[in-house]
Regions:
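TRAFAC-class small GTPase G-domain
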Residues: 2-212
């Protein structure tokens, strides 16, 4: 008994199989990251310095204005295998209601504080608490950046960590960390990005990246 094969169909199927394997092998992991925090915390300066760290065109740090709306940048990491799409969203009180619109699509959150401004501790604490208790970001890695460490009048990093831990102690288990940085000088900026990439990849089952 002779079995006839549809050679045309077999070749077509093989082509799509090979194409799918090729695309899967060569696709990159894309993660959306929110950069949040009060106004004047240094969010945009952090973003621009991060771009500069990875040899991307960036703005003059002396000409950065308060963000009204959002700034967006894509930064390749991990030998170009991972792409971070960073959303720097305005931190003025009237703009914070916009933050929730981004929660459902984010894979990680960077929360930036001005560690020299003791008068706004309660304000940024309340803002951070409102973020991490939201069901839309359950399980999402949270990285707090204690910015402006180049200044002599910064709070002790241990005091900032204590405040963060008091906020985070009642939420579901997730990766979180407090890092001291200076967005102006670049100290700690790359370390922050590297930490976040590792946590995003650990969290892939809960928040899968977009492959393309």
């Amino acid at each position: 008994m002779l079995i006839k094969y549809n050679t045309r169909v077999d070749i077509h199927s093989m082509f799509h199989l090979v194409k799918g394997l090729y695309n899967n092998w060569n696709s990159k992991e894309h993660y959306s990251i929110l950069i949040l925090g009060l106004d004047n915390a240094g969010k945009t300066t952090f973003l621009e310095t991060l771009k500069k760290e990875f040899s991307m065109a960036s703005k003059d740090l002396n000409k950065i204005a308060p963000t009204v709306g959002q700034n967006v940048a894509q930064i390749p990491m991990d030998n170009n295998k991972t792409i971070l799409k960073l959303w720097d969203v305005g931190g003025q009180e009237t703009l914070r209601s916009m933050w929730t619109e981004y929660y459902h699509q984010c894979h990680g959150i960077i929360f930036v504080i001005d560690s020299t401004d003791r008068s706004r501790i309660d304000e940024w604490s309340d803002a951070l608490r409102s973020i991490i208790v939201d069901d839309e970001v359950e399980g999402v890695p949270v990285l707090m950046l204690a910015n402006k460490q180049d200044r002599p009048d910064t709070m002790e990093i241990q005091d900032i960590k204590q405040i963060f831990n008091q906020i985070a102690e009642h939420i579901s288990a997730r990766d979180s960390r407090v890092l001291p940085i200076s967005a102006l000088t670049g100290v700690g900026v790359r370390e922050a990005a590297d930490w976040l990439v590792v946590r995003l990849q650990r969290n892939k089952e809960s928040r899968p990246p977009i492959y393309k």
